[in-house]
Amino acid sequence: MAGGELWAEESRRVEVHDVEHDSGSWALTWTSAVTNRRAEPLRFGSPTTAGREMAGYTGLFWRGPRAFRDGRIIGPDGEGPGLMASQSPWLALSGEHDGADGHATVVFEHAPANDHTGAGGSHPAHWFVRNEPFAGIAPSWAFFDELELAPGDTLTRGYRVVVADGAWEREEIAKYLRTHPW
């Protein structure tokens, strides 16, 4: 509420599933539905839409531990920090643990209903991802352009986050996502 006026209502659902002790992986799905309750449009932006170059984070954001600095950024068709602002169904970051001989991989995947490319008429999403000066991933729906939500409209977005022991390769990630459908 702003000045006593209700601007928006959100319904959020978080579920943990696909816990696999053998592979050391588990998944979390996160779904949010925000409804504009104002009589005028709501505008969602990012630091990039406000003029700060390549800082287009919005929505769900994961900031990794210090150990993931300089971690490996992996996408379906590429690798590295150059995937910042790219579009793809999923993106992963793999890093080495501090003080232990081990790695972990975190995979973010758009829900099929997200229309993340905008091909179906939705506002397109781009990945905010970095491994320096900190590790972070956000499937940003207002990276380059503000998203306008009309009065009474609802913005629904869903994501799956997979957390896995080990430094997974692109093929392992793709296989996991194929064999664990939404």
Description of each model-found segment:
Residues 1-24:
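Extended, loop-rich substrate-binding clefts of extracytoplasmic carbohydrate-active enzymes
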Residues 41, 45-116:
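Active-site/ligand-binding surface loops and adjacent short beta/alpha elements
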Residues 28-36:
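Short, well-ordered beta-strand segments enriched in hydrophobic/aromatic residues
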Residues 18-29, 61-63:
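Active-site loop segments of alpha/beta catalytic cores
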Residues 7, 25-27, 55-57, 154-156:
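A general secondary-structure signal for short beta-strands and their flanking turns/coil
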Residues 12, 32, 157-161:
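A structural signal for short, well-ordered beta-strand segments
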Residues 107-182:
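Beta-strand-rich recognition/accessory modules
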Residues 35-39, 166:
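Short solvent-exposed strand-capping/beta-turn motif centered on an Asx-Ser/Thr pair
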